[in-house]
């Protein structure tokens, strides 16, 4: 769980999110040829933070990718990102 912990710590530090979910989905891809077999290659993150206010979806993804540059250059093969402001995370009325 080293990479998962690192992802969680870095995102928490960078964005001080109201909600942070880090889900290791590597087990869903274990049989894929591109899977390194480490058990920490595919992740999904949900980050709800004020830091995304006024930013486009592309800019938000770039922000997350920049924070996790080291992990993405290494053993992380795939990262699904959902980055929202607190207001965007509220259910539609």
Question: Where do the protein language model's features map onto the residues?
Answer:
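N-terminal first-folded block
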Residues: 1-36
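A short, structured beta-strand/loop element
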Residues: 32-49
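Histidine-centered active-site/metal-ligand motif
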Residues: 29-32, 42, 61, 77
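Solvent-exposed beta-strand sheet faces enriched in polar/charged residues
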Residues: 23, 46-48, 80-84
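C-terminal structural segments of small proteins and small subunits
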Residues: 58-93
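A generic structural signal for short beta-strands and their flanking turns/coil linkers
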Residues: 16-18, 39-43, 75-79
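Short, conserved charged micro-motifs
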Residues: 52-57
